[in-house]
Amino acid sequence: MKLLIKGGTVVDPVAGKIEEKDVFIVDGKIARAGAHVNTAGAEVLDASGKLVVPGLIDMHVHLREPGFEARETIYTGTRAAARGGFTSVACMPNTSPVADNGAVISFIKACGLKGAVNVYPIGAITRGSKGEELAEMGDMKEAGAVAFSDDGMPVMNAGLMRRALQYAGMLGMVVISHCEDKNLSAGGVMHEGYVSTMLGLKGIPASAEEVMVARDILLAEETGSRVHIAHVSTAGSVRLIREAKARGVRVTAEVAPHHFTLTDEAVLGYDTSTKVNPPLRSAGDVAAVREGLADGTIDVIATDHAPHTEEEKDVEYDLAPFGMVGLETAVGLVWTELVAAGVLTPLQAVVKMTLNPARVLGIPKGTLEPGADADITIIDPDLSEPVDPARFASKGRNTPFRGRLLKGLPWATIVGGRVVMQDRVIR
């Protein structure tokens, strides 16, 4: 099969260049890219006026299968990814059973082969994500796990986390840390501050995140292993990561779109789709996160896509589960809130959604080099539409961005040379 993407502006994160090129794909691989490539017999995709970038990678999603298929399945979650412009997703292990052994990792891999995009499983750090004993890391790596995390739960035992970093380091893998001190966050439902006091809701202090970020940076520094800080939300965390990088600590970090767009004031209407963990923080925290994105302290933009059923979220704020969906709004939020606002250049934004997550996970993606898998996202910077959850491919509708006009949207998603989404419609 041959496909020619013609007339687009190629954003190349490896070369660090943006230039008009045609991209020629043969049998699922990138054959070549250059000016005015003419190839007889190829299907032509006109990308004039659009950005052609390596397939976007979301390294933090919750696909909910096995065990929570009412919220999402690998089938629906990968379709949501395709509609959102993502060609690869890495799914967290907080399923039922927990993905803490090779058998569950193999099941997710097998189901992922039938999905619309590439699926990379992340294995649990501890058995059952209970934080008591290490899971079988070697078996999970052999089965296809690309990283280890107890996301949704912190590893409270510092000695256990130290051993996890040591073992992961020996395997050449990264540990993704959900930084939350449960002794500080216990019972909290939103950011601790003026708004939580006004609403009468128990708060989660910034220190609940920051003390664990500091701990895991120290453990990574001592062991020489790699740690990736998930969903950074506070100014203090950004500062700690920036200082650690300056010392040469092998730490990387990600931020979710809701943490660079929304503050705790979004909770004023008691909309349970604003209930996330870590919580929406103060305006100062949002500004610090944006600064961390701009100066390279934060390496990756990842959604923390966390679908829930309408019934689960349609309860009092205190009782609702944490989480919001993000796969189908991420690109629009990045382009509207960061690129159009001048926080990031288009190239910087693409690097944080392609090359950097690929490098953190150690997967052969995020490039448009000849011979690479033909995973490509085409973004139309002029395309705009309001967020309409009724059009989501995800089972989850729990978004606080309902009705928000976003400009700069994925126009086509190509996985292995096959167009899986075009004109906002999944094929």
Swiss-Prot record:
| Residues annotated as catalytic | 304
What would you give as a GO molecular function for this chain, any one? Answer: allantoinase activity
Query: What does the entry list as the binding residues for Zn(2+) 2?
Result: 151, 178, 231
Its recorded reaction(s) are:
(S)-dihydroorotate + H2O = N-carbamoyl-L-aspartate + H(+)
Q: How is the cofactor bound?
A: Binds 2 Zn(2+) ions per subunit.
Respond yes or no to whether keyword Repeat is given for this record.
no
- Name the Gene Ontology biological process terms: 'de novo' UMP biosynthetic process; purine nucleobase catabolic process
Checking InterPro entries in the record gives:
Amidohydro-rel, DHOase, DHOase/Allantoinase_Hydrolase, Dihydroorotase_CS, Metal-dep_hydrolase_composite, Metal_Hydrolase
Enzyme Commission (EC) number: 3.5.2.3
Name the PROSITE patterns on file: DIHYDROOROTASE_1 (PS00482), DIHYDROOROTASE_2 (PS00483)
Residues recorded as binding Zn(2+) 1, renumbered to this chain, are 60, 62, 151, 304
Residues reported in the UniProt entry to bind substrate: 62-64, 94, 277, 308, 322-323
Q: Give the UniProt family note.
A: Belongs to the metallo-dependent hydrolases superfamily. DHOase family. Class I DHOase subfamily.
Any idea what job this protein has? Catalyzes the reversible cyclization of carbamoyl aspartate to dihydroorotate.
Question: What is the protein named?
Answer: Dihydroorotase
- Organism, by scientific name, is Pelotomaculum thermopropionicum (strain DSM 13744 / JCM 10971 / SI)
Q: Which gene encodes it?
A: pyrC
